[in-house]
Amino acid sequence: MARPRLIAPSRTLLFVESHPSSPHLAVPSTFPAPSRLAPSGVRSGVAGGLNPENRIAYQGEPGANSDAACREMFPELEPLPCPTFEDAFDAVETGLADLAMIPVDNSIAGRVADIHRLLPESGLHIVGEHFLPIHFQLMALPGTRLEDIRAVRSHIHALGQCRQILREHDWAPAIADDTAGAAREVAELADPTVAAFSPRLAAELYGLQILLEDVEDEHDNTTRFLVLAREPRDFSLHAGPMISTFVFRVRNVPAALYKAMGGFATNGVNMTKLESYQLGGTFFATQFYADVEGHPKDTALALALEELAFFSVHLKMLGTYPASPYRAQIAEPAENRQLRPTHQGNEV
């Protein structure tokens, strides 16, 4: 049987939000106005101390994983869909939204492209984090049977994370701009031979039927989101664990990075993330992005940052915020220490 020809994603809808104090300021979007349906099956990780009021911006269409993350962490806010990450950043900078929910890492796909570049340039501050388990549902028009399906639409990363079921059923993968957008396109096509891999929320929003649940290859797939605001929050009285995020560039001398990192080791500060990326399309200007445990006012972290600054030509704090409770679930087991090399029965 011949494969159906799939049309390009539809871009006919328009959603324009105007700032009440600036009638000429608007953020155009091809997405419909966000719904207030509650999500199901998402993991909580609320950062205390925030006092959001109106809207939270995210990149993607209504029903996307970023939409679900917004609804889970801030159910009192109105999700504001934005076509691009830049638009989501701009919505906060211009006052169209109080916060933005931006994905930064995925446990399978790795870091989200461009965020490490956009975040330092934006002038926004990280004020929270959220971990969302990523599950994809096979959805189609109501009444569709599995044997009717010939092709499945989704974002390229989602298709890559659902390879097994695609091979089992010999379904043709079709790339869409967005996982939620794939569900919308299936509803618009009204073709029972075309289905979508999308979040559960998308089926509710676009009136689709879920045929198979959690079809992803790896069920521990998780995305970490950062919550951004125009101004930093004061978490000095927060009693729980904190995370501090910053970017830096070291001096172009031998062992500069090694020496810059030494302060974290000698002061007992745990670094949970360290990544490098090139600046400005060059191969000689490298910037590092880091997450560490603690608050800059803590003596240990203050000393470590002081030593880092000595060996750096640039150091910028992006935010200090409460650690998500989910971190306690993914903490390294104590028994892993037994895997370290030993000498005559003693740890070395």
Model-found features: residue ranges?
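Domain-level signature for soluble enzymes in the chorismate/prephenate branch of the shikimate pathway
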Residues: 2-348
